[in-house]
Amino acid sequence: MNKCSQFVIYVLCLFSVLLSQHVMANEKTYRCEVLTDAYIKSNGELSIVQDSPRVGQEFAVVKRTGEVIGDVMDSLKNPKVLASGSKSNPYKVIWVQRSAGKNGAFVDYLSIEESASGGKKPFGFFSGGLLMTGVCEQ
């Protein structure tokens, strides 16, 4: 192998390392913890679930894709990121799944308040009559 070939291989290796670091840096993830678990009662009032097994559970959200990793919401498929978040607009992702009934659908929604001061950003997760709240960090 001549010096020119070695140099080309070196440059290609260096480029691939730098590119992979750039990709990983852009793959930001939220780490979230559930602090409150509630549901909407039949009379429209909000009821906090006492001793909920969800409280204290953690999950992660891949910011670019909306994919959720963790037991709290692991069954959610095909997320759609509606807003990637900024100082003036929360990060928003939805999941839409067809229900068994005609023209029915299940819609789940996650909002993370990126504009909140400090490192912990409040979130709200809504699924039908279920509401979970907590905090996320990047």
Q: Can you annotate each of these PLM segments?
A:
Residues M1-V11:
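Bacterial N-terminal signal peptides that target proteins for export
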Residues S20-H22:
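N-terminal signal peptide c-region/cleavage motif recognized by signal peptidases
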Residues E33-V68, G104-D108:
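Short, solvent-exposed loop/hinge segments that bridge or flank secondary-structure elements
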Residues R64-V107:
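Contiguous, well-ordered beta-strand patches that form the walls/edges
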Residues G119-G129:
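Short, exposed beta-strand-loop hairpins at the edges of beta-sheets
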Residues E137-Q138:
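Short, solvent-exposed mixed-charge patches
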